[in-house]
Each structure stands twice: as C-alpha cells, then as structure tokens.
Amino acid sequence: FFTAIAGGLEKADITAILASAEEAAFPIAAQRGQCGTVDVMTPYVNGLKEKILSALGCAKDEKPFSGLKIVVDAGNGAGGFFAERLLEPLGADITGSRFLEPDGRFPNHQPNPENADAMRSICDAVTETGADFGIIFDTDVDRAGAVLPSDGGVIALDRNRLIALMTAILVRQYGPITVVTDSI
C-alpha cells in the first residue's frame, strides 16, 4: 500500500500484517460455501443510465442521445460495455467505436488516455466517422479522455482540459466550487 502522505509500508509493517494473519483464528463454517456467477454489470449499467436520464431530465424510456454519433475507444480494456450497453441503448450511434473487446495483450495501442498514440486513435476515429464526440478509456475505466470535432479537426480533452470542462459544467449547476486534482 502507498499513500502520498504516509508513503509505503515498511518491512516491519508487512511482517506485522503477516504475523497477524498467521495468528488469526479462522473458524470452520457451519456449512460449506457455494460458488456461483453474479451479474454485476446489469445493475451497474442500469444505475448509470438512471443517473444520465435524471441529470438530463428525461423519462426512463427516452433516448437522449438519438441523433448523436459517439465513438468509444476502449483500448481492449474493460470499457467496451460503455458503448454497447450504455450509449447505444440511450440512442447514440456508436458506429466506428473501436477495440471494445477486452484483450489483456492490448494489441491495438496502450490503453491509456494520456498516451499520445491512444489519443491519436480516438482523434482518428472521430475524424473518420464524423462523430459528434469521442471518448477513450484506460484499462479499468477509471480514467478517460474525450475528443470534440472542431473546424475540420478535433480538440482533444485529456487531463486538465477535461477537468476544466467538467468544472465549467458543475459551476453552472452548483455555483462556485473548489476542484482538487492531481492530473498535472
């Protein structure tokens, strides 16, 4: 474990954790556990849809992205669902989205919106398809970059530019706010 304030664990810390685990009494369960499959994506995607529809003031059956072409570059990471299970059902045309199937070898480009080749990939996708918007995710979908068409070219919104755009949206909704970021 590592934190910016406390730093990483020292050898003594790790030794203490291992000793604690070794000494812990793990009682035998009264009955045997079970293995199974649980669908976590459907409730997650439905929750995202509800948040989007609510934020846009739309009814549950509306398709607020109808008429918009939105391309996604998932970089063969976990973000492919975003195009097929979220944007498309909300009405977006996702034709031209790329690398939606997870592949841990990442054969197309590094799945990192801060990587120049990756950003070039989503910029090309927006230009080639005439998309209204492009979004690129990292491997585990906790970072993103965005692309907007502009006068025959594109504007890449990564790192601070994306934070600035989100801040502008939030200021309109909530008034003055404080934003803390480590995206520099």
Set out the residue ranges of the language-model regions.
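Gly/Ser/Thr-enriched, mixed-charge loops and adjacent short helices
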Residues: 1-129
